[in-house]
Amino acid sequence: MEVTALRRSAALVARASSQNAIRPAVCAAISSTSPTPPTQIQTQQTRQFSALNRPPPNYPGHVPLTRLERFGLFVGSGLISLADPLRGDLIASFAEATATPYFIYRLRDAMLSHPTGRRILRQRPRITSQSLNIPYLRSLPPNTVGRTYIDWLDREGVSPDTRSAVRYIDDEECAYVMQRYRECHDFYHALTGLPIVREGEVALKAFEFANTLLPMTGFSVFAAFTMKKSEQKRFRKIYFPWAVKNGLRAKEVINVFWEEELERDVNDLRRELGVEPPPDLREIRKREREEKRRRKEMERMLSGRGTEDVIQKAEKEAEVVAERVKEMRNEVVEKVGEVVGSSAMRG
């Protein structure tokens, strides 16, 4: 009897021990299927929301954008720059918003496929007033690239230091390609002779689009519809055909190492690149203003006030002529008197 009781007690103890060992595992299994604590839910939500935020910058000054932010930058800067093509800051933002994902890579590949372009990408030079040595450019002969460039800067009242830094292109090398294009823009102006007036900027943007295929340059051409009718007509007949022809025919201007061409004859460089300067836009605009001024004067003269002015002017001229005739008559009378007197003395 005692042995049997001991065996039963041992069995009960073993059963209790096994149940105690199973209970933590069951509790752990139950706890794994229980609702997530509030703090853990908040952490997951924060992690999901952070995916919508900007990633870390890839280079100094870089501002990464989400797709929504890039779209907003595209719409806002595009509409305002279309109305005012001289807003360089908005045009720069619009260029960066539309250059990716394809077009800036195509321009980068064009540089990589050219020996000079590859050197530019390796050295990454910047075009500023310090790097170009402005006083030296002014000492160059008039027909050189450097002198043509600095004369254009002085005539238009601009500086190479006004180009803003690229911020919205994610790839660092492509960001430099955009920066290089931006800083070379004034060299394109000097090479073609186009001024920074709206008409000249739109014409140069059309040239750049045909040569670089950057979307911003193509969209900028639509700013021609905001110009005056006379300017639109001139752009349609002269400068747009010139831009398309020369932009497609010319070599990739992004591959020009301008810093090494400063002492070269500008016409030789134009021939090498295949760029033919357009008609002088400033001279055309000057002649147009003079023609308008003469036309207004003619209209004023043909009006009532103008007729009165003409009559008064004619009367004054008639008085002057009459006075002169009177003086001439007196002179003739005096001469005749002298002749008669001398004849009488001889007689």
Swiss-Prot record:
Keywords carried by this UniProt record: Lyase, Membrane, Metal-binding, Mitochondrion, Mitochondrion inner membrane, Transit peptide, Ubiquinone biosynthesis, Zinc
Top enzyme class: lyase
GO biological process: ubiquinone biosynthetic process
Catalytic activity: a 4-hydroxy-3-methoxy-5-(all-trans-polyprenyl)benzoate + H(+) = a 2-methoxy-6-(all-trans-polyprenyl)phenol + CO2
Cellular-component GO terms for this entry: extrinsic component of mitochondrial inner membrane; mitochondrion
Transit peptide: 1-49
Known pathway: Cofactor biosynthesis; ubiquinone biosynthesis
Keyword Transit peptide: yes
Residues given in the record as Zn(2+) binding sites: H185, D186, H189, E201
Record localization: Mitochondrion inner membrane
E.C. designation(s): 4.1.1.130
Assembly with partners or alone: Component of a multi-subunit COQ enzyme complex, composed of at least coq-3, coq-4, coq-5, coq-6, coq-7 and coq-9.
Protein known as: Ubiquinone biosynthesis protein coq-4, mitochondrial
Biological source species: Neurospora crassa (strain ATCC 24698 / 74-OR23-1A / CBS 708.71 / DSM 1257 / FGSC 987)
